[in-house]
A protein has these predicted regions:
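Rossmann-like dinucleotide-binding domain that binds NAD(P)(H)
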Residues: 177-271, 277-282, 351
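C-terminal helix-rich "cap/oligomerization" subdomain common to oxidoreductases
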Residues: 6-15, 23, 82-84, 267, ...
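A contiguous active-site-proximal alpha/beta segment in oxidoreductase catalytic domains
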Residues: 10-11, 113-175, 194
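Hydrophobic residues in well-ordered beta-strands that form the structural core
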Residues: 108-109, 133-135, 274, 299
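Beta-loop-alpha module in the N-terminal Rossmann-like domain of NAD(P)-dependent dehydrogenases
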Residues: 62-125, 142
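N-terminal Rossmann-like dinucleotide-binding module
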Residues: 7-62
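NAD(P)-dinucleotide binding in Rossmann-like oxidoreductases
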Residues: 240, 245-332
Length: 376
């Protein structure tokens, strides 16, 4: 095994014409990741949020030319070439469809849709309009970490089983994350990351089974005005900010799964995905572990990033071998701009997003009915 191999395929962002962006949804993710990156590396033309004060504050903080309360007005703004959709889950698909109808390139946050019908409509509209559309989370296709992982798995034989875990204590800035009717819960918010990785590495599973539970029946979230007034220079303007200085006080009833376990059957090889909103800390264990007939691989959030144990020996890959790993939000923006400039189809396309959505919905059905759901 050669340790000097390098997997990174740098995106030629410096050579790509900057795009004029509009961002729909001015919440935590937008202000932490998309807005500051676009403002630094592209052109931020406009922002929109149904809470007008959030739009105004975000525009002022990041230098957007215009702000809107109505997303449709942003979508019809001729100065906007591309949009980022980072709203609550139930509005992702309608806004993606509208963006395509308006001829706007777009990045849509996960989940792309909450029904197969909506996902199919997005695919149709994108194909008809010819816009470039990126479905999040893009890291399974854009991150050099997962390109390296895929390369390492190629020589390890048959997939036997794998464990995939994502969890934290839960978001405090919106009640929508806990509302099943709004597409809330850990499946669509957190398990989606590992489902997207599994679909990229192994394709669609033959069948899935799942269990979901509501471990904490009531949660506390911030007052909407608290999340709004937090948009200022001494919070997001200084770096990534997650309301550490604010105490949630508004009780909300939890109707969406906050604890979830899914099993994906790949022709006998089983992948187990675990996601939760209830862990206050994380153990120092690899969140991704894969076991094959000829070896095993673990992926770590700290160095070394990948550890491979095979019959031929053991080796580790760090940042030196793998390359720069951008936050996927940033990689998606640059990839969209590159694809627009070159007239190419993006890797995390809406067709790929459709496959991820199909598996997510099957897992949701399995968890709610207690039955195994076939995808074959």
């Amino acid at each position: 095994l050669r340790a000097e191999r390098v997997y990174i395929r740098p995106l030629a962002v410096a050579l790509v014409k900057k795009l004029s962006f509009g961002v729909i949804g001015c919440g935590n993710v937008a202000n932490n990741y998309y807005l500051p990156y676009i403002a630094r590396n592209h052109e931020l033309v406009a922002v929109a949020d149904t809470i007008s004060e959030r739009a105004r504050r975000s525009a002022e903080l990041w230098g957007a030319v215009k702000w809107y309360e109505d997303p449709d007005k942003l979508l019809s703004d001729p100065r906007v070439e591309a949009v980022v959709i980072v709203t609550s889950h139930e509005s992702h698909a309608p806004l993606a469809i509208r963006a395509a109808e308006e001829g706007k390139h777009f990045v849509v946050q996960k989940p792309m849709a909450l029904s197969l019908k909506a996902a199919e409509e997005i695919v149709r509209k994108v194909e008809k309009s010819g816009v470039v559309a990126v479905a999040e989370p893009s890291d399974p296709l854009l991150s050099p970490l997962f390109r390296a992982l895929k390369s390492e798995l190629a020589g390890l034989g048959r997939h036997c089983y794998s464990l995939w875990h994502t969890g934290h204590s839960g978001p405090t800035w919106s009640e929508a994350f806990f509302d099943d009717a709004k597409g809330g819960g850990v499946l669509f918010d957190l398990a989606v990351y590992d489902v997207a990785r599994l679909v990229t590495l192994f394709g669609e599973p033959n069948r899935v089974a799942a269990l979901g539970s509501v471990l904490m029946e009531e949660r506390l979230v911030l007052k909407p005005e608290e999340a709004t007034t937090a948009i200022r220079r001494d919070t997001y303007g200084r770096g990534v900010y997650y309301f550490h200085d604010l105490k949630p006080s508004v009780p909300v009833k939890v109707t969406a799964f906050d604890d979830f376990a899914g099993i994906l059957d790949y022709g006998g090889g089983l992948a187990v995905t675990l996601a939760n909103y209830v862990t206050f800390t994380q153990l120092h264990m690899p969140p991704i572990q894969l076991y094959f007939t000829e070896g095993a691989v673990s992926v770590h959030p700290y160095a070394p990033l990948i550890v491979v144990r095979a019959k031929s020996g053991e080796r580790s890959l760090g940042r030196e071998q793998i390359g720069e790993i951008k936050p996927y939000y940033h990689a998606s923006i640059d990839h969209l701009a590159e694809c627009v400039a070159k007239g190419e189809k993006p890797l995390p396309s809406v067709e790929w997003g459709y496959k991820v959505t199909k598996v997510l919905l099957a897992l949701n059905e399995a968890a709610k009915t207690g039955k195994t759901v076939s995808l074959a």
